[in-house]
Amino acid sequence: LGPSGSGKSFFTNHLVRQYWEQGTHILLVDTGNSYKGLCDLIHQKTGGDDGIYFTYKENDPISFNPFFTEDYQYDIEKRDSIKTLILTLWKREDEPPRRSEEVALSNAVSLYIGKIRKNRKIKPNFNSFYDFVRKDYRKVLADKNVREKDFDVDGFLNVLEPYYKNGEYGYLLNSDKELDLLNKRFIVFELDVVKDNPILFPVVTIIIMETFINKMRRLQGIRKMILIEEA
């Protein structure tokens, strides 16, 4: 603790750089661009392989691809984070999903993952998931005689359409960078612009949680650090 200008960020920059030099995986959640310089330095030092900086700019909005993994491994946490993310976009806070809707969404995610693992020509992202639900999964529901009141696929697609292709938020979950954060050791999420946005902030929060949980579960024996500024 200390007042503004007392050197907190200066000290923390030095600390996390030393941890990074020693092989630690570091995830920083920041407001105020305190770690932009260090992140750029690491990005340059590693030839672009590390030092990943997420922020929102009008001409370069923040974007992710939560469906992408380099090794096509989708463990329980990864599948659950995808379902949680879609539920967050689909349902309002005061509108809890029915059990039948949760089951239908879980099945859709599982079948979609099965399809992209089998056919790796399909690019994993929200666009291809949306297409899968609209075509393949609609047929699955019809074959199983799932009633509209149990899962309204047209309503589902309508609510999520803004995140598809040329929709208002079509950029958000369709990043073409094919960036798997599991093996990136220095990641900064700059939240200054998105922290008050009711659409972007919940999505970014889920991505942060999933990223660190994935590291905790899969990178055994490696030191990890999550640091939240202004917590």
Language-model features: locations:
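P-loop NTPase motor domains
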Residues: 33-49, 58-231
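Glycine-rich phosphate-binding loop of nucleotide-binding enzymes
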Residues: 1-56
